[in-house]
Amino acid sequence: CDWSSDVCSSDLGARIANACAALHLSLKELTVDCGIDILSFGGTKNGLMMGECVIIFNKDLQREARFVRKQSAQLASKMRYLSCQFTAYLTDDLWLKNAAHANAMAAKLYQALKELPEVTFTQKPESNQLFLTMPRPTIDRMLESYFFYFWNEANHEIRLVTSFDTTEEDVNQFI
């Protein structure tokens, strides 16, 4: 990270696909056009079994990056098995379709939850994550059946995240 911040502008893109889908922008518009030199293009949170793809947009940094990758232990012995997932992931914009679906499921969940008087959204819903508060007893009941994180336990703020495989039935059942 020190090398990255000293030499270039980088972005850790675990949810960059969701941002592209939500903003209706291309990956280029959210990276290269904004001055990003290196992107960790996330796949695990958007449908891949595992793996992130490091994309180096700045040609001057590409040669040195091969060595930095090894020094920071980011070279899996069977990299080709991890990498081959990206062929399908990038074909026909599957990465973008998965993200758009996750965002749509979050929007559906938001529309239902905003009608509940005990729910207050703490951040404007923009992608596949919802941040909200509700009474602690309600949260405790929900935790018996669903897994989610406290974002700020002091004020009962939780984070709900939808994904590429969240179905409308999942959302309806949660509601």
Where does each model-flagged region fall?
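Single conserved hydrophobic/aromatic residue that forms the stacking wall/gate
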Residues: 1-7
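Glycine-rich nucleotide phosphate-binding loop and flanking beta-alpha elements
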Residues: 17, 47, 138
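Active-site C-terminal subdomain of aminotransferase-like
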Residues: 21-22, 26-129
